[in-house]
Amino acid sequence: MIDYSIFYTRPIEYTKISENLPNFDIFISAFNDSERVKTLFESITSTKKFWLVHPEYHFSNEEIPSAEVNEVIIPSDITDISQVNELLSRIGDLSDKNICIDITGFMRHVLIFLVASLKYNGVDKFTAIYSEPKFYSDGDNTNFSTTTSSIVKSISGISATSNSEFKDHLIINIGYDHKMLSQIASYKDGATYHPVFSFPSLSADMYQQSSMRAALSGSITQNSDWITKRKFSPANNPFATAQVISDLVKELDLNFNGKNNIYLAPLSTKAQTLGFAIYWVLEGRDRGITILLPECLSYSRETSQGLKRLWSYEVELKV
């Protein structure tokens, strides 16, 4: 059993980024219109810097950063495997490299597959950075995924064969995307739901806002599981999130003699999405757990205002 509390996390003063963080060999960030993302990219000291331009943001060629100074990767399609493979192919050798990833602007499915791919490629550790906004632009009306298809699917390679005789359990991280929440719940209709709410939230009003948005998702909020089985994890702490998932899975396997099909659906902050990825890499893969997400066709380029604070997470992939 892994104790995720031993993983190291610390706040970073955003006016002293270069002083508080070491020099890196490789820095990766997903380009969008957020000043949080652009400020960090400019402030980080790294031998090589890579912009990953997600197709879901639909940037024109004129809007994409110049490739004269830093590497710019423009994947050919939206699949997680294509985006990550094109990124890693451009980066090249990862051995003995000090790697930093700004997870703030990443699409969830790509972030999860990237963490799994780093593990597969022998990377033992990396630093992840997450920047908190002061507030979301439209409060409880903020839209993140602007267009999704009708497809819900597992992350590439992050799935297990289900047993029709076992009980389905869906551990779902609750965020602002009520449409995605509704899609996931409908896809696993009949499963036992285990909602994980982001609390403490990034700010005092965000928990209430996400709860109000989740209420729009339909029948899942009328299910008794919504109240009786809810859990909480801090919105800005991936390791605490991984611990909540780990403890819950162990509890379910103990109660049902391991006869469970377990599905994870990270729909909240990128810090918590990282926590889902860390759990899967260190425990969920061997347990046979599937991570599900609705297919996102377009995503809002900027949903927030201001930079509240930065967090640095030392992610260990070999424990």
Set out the residue ranges of the language-model regions.
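Long, low-complexity, Lys/Arg-enriched
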Residues: 1-98, 106-319
